[in-house]
Swiss-Prot record:
Interacts with IscS. GO terms for cellular component: cytoplasm. Keywords: Cytoplasm, tRNA processing. Belongs to the sulfur carrier protein TusA family. NCBIfam families: PRK00299.1 (NF001423). InterPro entries: Sulphur_carrier_TusA, TusA-like, TusA-like_sf. It holds the Pfam family TusA. The active site is at 19 (cysteine persulfide intermediate). This is Sulfur carrier protein TusA. Its main location: cytoplasm. It comes from the Bacteria. GO terms for molecular function: sulfur carrier activity. It comes from Edwardsiella ictaluri (strain 93-146).
């Protein structure tokens, strides 16, 4: 079995941060990425289980995977093209 979270282009550690900080950091990080690059987000704020998927939909990025059964939560985002 392949670990989808292995080898992302960038990693963002949002542990200990609370809403809205994790999403603000994701937005800032993604802004400096090239379309198609991947970002691993590691967070422990329960609000990210709603906020990260919503951010991806709104900003037209792809949420490739999420692991939210236990903390730390992990999300793998692929930057959309624009």
């Amino acid at each position: 079995m392949t670990d989808l979270f292995a080898n992302p282009d960038k990693t963002l550690d949002a542990l200990g941060l609370r809403c809205p900080e994790p999403v603000m950091m994701v937005r800032k990080t993604v802004r400096h990425m090239v379309a198609g690059e991947t970002l691993l987000i590691i967070a422990d704020d329960p609000a990210t289980t709603r906020d990260i998927p919503g951010f991806c939909r709104f900003m037209e990025h792809t949420l490739l995977a999420q692991e939210i059964e236990q903390t730390p939560y992990r999300y793998l985002l692929r930057k959309g093209g624009a």
